[in-house]
Amino acid sequence: DPTSACNLHCTGCWAAEYGNKLNLSFDDMDSIVTQGKELGIYFYMMTGGEPMVRKKDIIELCRKHNDCVFFAYTNGTLVDEALCKQMQEVGNLFLALSVEGEPDVNDMRRGEGVYNKVMHAMDLLKEHGLVFGTSICYTSANYKSVTSEDFIQMLVDKGCRYALYFHYMPVGNAASVDLLLNPEQRIYVKNRVR
């Protein structure tokens, strides 16, 4: 991961435990990709922290290694017009924006106003013709809403081409075990996203 730094402080996120201390230099990231290519690896996933805190370096990495594909999980709040134009230019960076359902449920864990920022980021990415998707953390509070036809249709309408679902794990910043799913809720999600 390029960094442990993040511009948000989401409830239950492990990244908050690391603060802003862990950062790979551009040279380290470049070396990882160079070594990976020697092994035949041309697809790289980035998490964080928030990878877009390092968007300048990530774009440069994409530019330098234009024979590779880079995929980043992002909270979406740092996606702007300039980044979209740079993504068009390099053509090998794809994002999965985190969203967890309706605005109130999403912002309960991620912070006030984050849902609207993510929706704006999706609009920008779509306007620029970029391929992007979403990363959905499902909990006992949102598992039905994030698997509903209406929610999925909203994502399609926004321009999402893929959705990655993963279940909540209570680690990190003010983690709540109340958000864990019981076995029946997990089965419900499995049957909905098949």
What do the predicted segments below correspond to?
Residues 15-23, 108-114, 178-181:
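Short glycine-enriched, charge-decorated loop/helix-capping segments at active-site entrances
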Residues 2, 53, 172-173:
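Flexible loop/turn segments at secondary-structure boundaries
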Residues 16-20, 102-104, 170-173:
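A short, flexible beta-alpha/helix-coil linker loop
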Residues 168-194:
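A C-terminal junction/extension of Radical SAM enzymes
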Residues 29-46, 54-167:
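Radical SAM/AdoMet-radical enzyme domain recognition
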Residues 1-27:
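Canonical Radical SAM [4Fe-4S] cluster-binding loop centered on the CxxxCxxC motif
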